[in-house]
């Protein structure tokens, strides 16, 4: 599933092609995604101008002058591309938003776990209203994590992936951040010290910022808007490397399932 760096990479690739463009039309080839695409999308978007494209957590928000925004989530396998308007649709190309410049924003989603919604006020939508702070914002600190974790018995990795705690940190970047901070993913969240949470918050910020710089992590389902690969995959320290040698100490990386998610860590480096 695309995580924050992949969604941010998508945003940065799309925004220059979308902002200021007038929407010519909308084609819904298959509206039954994770949630049905509202018919009002076809009615409200044509004729509207895109005023901004932004990100909240793993959601892309396409603001318009039609009094609302299109809310997009890539789900497990979704991708967005800006293509010449005469590009024939392929399998799983479910939505086209055609633009005045003759190009088309195309949403492809083989597994159909993504979504396209319409919302008058994005901040009040039930999917967005209860989200935690952005990890790259000043609000996300080790002191914040330590205070929120007090008394929690869940594994720290599960805690870090809770979108009400902090948004956009999924399985890949939680594993990598915990490794950099030297914290075992198995440790109870409420038993991690303030100082170690400060290291963890710094690690999350550093790894996410670097992953964005590298274009995200190209795994099975992520495609950036220009089709270029994300190069952070080449630098993963633990994720997906169970049984291999730790790149820091040389010890064998361990594997377990935590919160129904595959987890890899180094028992020597992470305590």
Swiss-Prot record:
DNA binds at residues 92, 111, 152. The active site is at residues 2-3, 58, 261. Belongs to the FPG family. Keywords: DNA damage, DNA repair, DNA-binding, Glycosidase, Hydrolase, Lyase, Metal-binding, Multifunctional enzyme, Zinc, Zinc-finger. Its EC number is 3.2.2.23, 4.2.99.18. Coiled coil: none annotated. Its cofactor is Zn(2+). HAMAP family: Fapy_DNA_glycosyl. A zinc finger (FPG-type) spans 237-271. This is Formamidopyrimidine-DNA glycosylase. It comes from the Bacteria. Monomer. Transmembrane segments: none annotated. Gene3D superfamilies: 1.10.8.50, MutM-like, N-terminal.
